Amino acid sequence: MNKYRVRLFSVFVVCMILVFCVLGLFLQQLFETSDQRKAEEHIEKEAKYLASLLDAGNLNNQANEKIIKDAGGALDVSASVIDTDGKVLYGSNGRSADSQKVQALVSGHEGILSTTDNKLYYGLSLRSEGEKTGYVLLSASEKSDGLKGELWGMLTASLCTAFIVIVYFYSSMTSRYKRSIESATNVATELSKGNYDARTYGGYIRRSDKLGHAMNSLAIDLMEMTRTQEMQRDRLLTVIENIGSGLIMIDGRGFINLVNRSYAKQFHINPNHMLRRLYHDAFEHEEVIQLVEDIFMTETKKCKLLRLPIKIERRYFEVDGVPIMGPDDEWKGIVLVFHDMTETKKLEQMRKDFVANVSHELKTPITSIKGFTETLLDGAMEDKEALSEFLSIILKESERLQSLVQDLLDLSKIEQQNFTLSIETFEPAKMLGEIETLLKHKADEKGISLHLNVPKDPQYVSGDPYRLKQVFLNLVNNALTYTPEGGSVAINVKPREKDIQIEVADSGIGIQKEEIPRIFERFYRVDKDRSRNSGGTGLGLAIVKHLIEAHEGKIDVTSELGRGTVFTVTLKRAAEKSA
């Protein structure tokens, strides 16, 4: 800004000097012309006056010479009297005179002869009775040098005064413009840095206010645009980072420039290890690399179901690859979306296994019933002993079939979203006492001691008594089933600060550690032969698990092969019994 002011000021100064020089030359010429005209008029009058004083008929008399000498001092001129032959008779400065001017005068050139050496010459003929008797020649110095000095002095003084005035107004004006322009420049600089809160404040010059208003309007518009873009970007990033599917973006050159959180979680990687790397170096799985190359080659959408190894497991991913095209069909890159289908595949497999198990479980009792019925129809009814045995088997298989159907109905009802519990506050000791009474006969038949251990003080839980009775009846019945003769089964109630633990412990055959995670699966049996002989359906523990989870409780299992198993159910504790 300062350099610009210096350049502008220099231009002003040069222009001003040129104007004053031209003006000075013009005035000088004007004054010189006017002064010369006045000098010519003045010397003409003096010459005519002097000629009127001279005695033209007798030029050599002493009176004429005295007049000429007196006139030289009085009129501040040099005067000479010349005869007709061009001889200088006398003069105010003696008999000296410019010979060229004398010759011109004698030749008939009267009036202003010339101006040389800053002198003005004027010649006039003298006549007596109509005859030319001589000449008078006057010369006077021009006084224009003093006038020129005064003129240029005035111009110089005017120039200095004008210079001071111009400098003052120029500095004042440019300072105001400078503040406005510098303010606008600073705002523009801040805007270029991304500081859209910068503003310029006017008031210096009205016209410059328009620039300030324009800059402020631009800043406001840029701020709004930036906020809108940031909001849209944040929304997009939020969506990208929080979608359940993994997402990767590859640019047109094959470099990965976006990896979302879901992908990093799915593949157990650090996103920074993949960013700004070529896809064939970043991806560990050849199937994904081949899919990307196919999209690059064909520029079409691809969708594949891939089974990829991740650490110690294999997971299924439905990978959608979509090419990104610009407005002019310009290739921008690829977006890969990884949908984790592992759970879906597991559910499909569970559904297949469930259908197969249900079919098998239903087929076994139906086959038995059909077989024994056909045997009876073929003539075995005549044998009373065989008839009684076959009918007992048919009854047993029918009861087993009924139990299976009932368990399937219970499991289906529990897994429905609209399944509800009849929650109330009750004392579990009474419910467990009823279970002990129901199963006491079975325990006595096998010679198993069944004990219920409850604290002396009443304890209350919040839950559905009917469903919880179903849970513990199943657990105690299983404990009796898998405990050999002479063993023991104990039901222990252990109150804690915020909940109550109810244990069902037996001294039975136990469960292998690798089988414990699977005992709550549908139709899974630890001892298949014993379970079938006892009439079990394989759905009891699956129902137990779902009912406990519906109560927001927890069930744990600890077991040692050959020494027994402990099922621990944790339920919410209630403060007091409801009225």
UniProtKB/Swiss-Prot annotation:
Extracellular topology ranges: 29-150
One biological process term in Gene Ontology: regulation of DNA-templated transcription
GO CC annotation terms, alphabetical: membrane raft; plasma membrane
One MF annotation (Gene Ontology) recorded for this entry: phosphorelay sensor kinase activity
Major enzyme class: transferase
Transmembrane segments: 8-28, 151-171
Membrane topology of this protein: Multi-pass membrane protein
Disulfide topology: none
Keywords for the protein's UniProt record, in alphabetical order: ATP-binding, Cell membrane, Kinase, Membrane, Nucleotide-binding, Phosphate transport, Phosphoprotein, Transferase, Transmembrane, Transmembrane helix, Transport, Two-component regulatory system
Pfam families to which the protein is assigned, alphabetical: HATPase_c, HisKA, PAS, sCache_like
Domain of life: Bacteria
Residues in PAS domain copies: 234-300
Subcellular compartments: Cell membrane; Membrane raft
Signal peptide: none
Topological domain spans for side Cytoplasmic: 1-7, 172-579
Domain Histidine kinase: 357-575
Phosphohistidine modifications at: 360
E.C. designation(s): 2.7.13.3
Catalytic activity reported: ATP + protein L-histidine = ADP + protein N-phospho-L-histidine
PANTHER family in the cross-refs: PHOSPHATE REGULON SENSOR PROTEIN PHOR (PTHR45453:SF1)
Function description: Member of the two-component regulatory system PhoP/PhoR involved in the alkaline phosphatase genes regulation. PhoR may function as a membrane-associated protein kinase that phosphorylates PhoP in response to environmental signals.
Subunit structure: Oligomerizes, probably forms homodimers. Interacts with FloA, colocalizes with FloA-only membrane rafts. Oligomerization is assisted by FloA. Another study shows only minor colocalization with FloA or FloT.
NCBIfam families (alphabetical): PnpS (NF046044), sensory_box (TIGR00229)
Name listed for the protein in its UniProt record: Alkaline phosphatase synthesis sensor protein PhoR
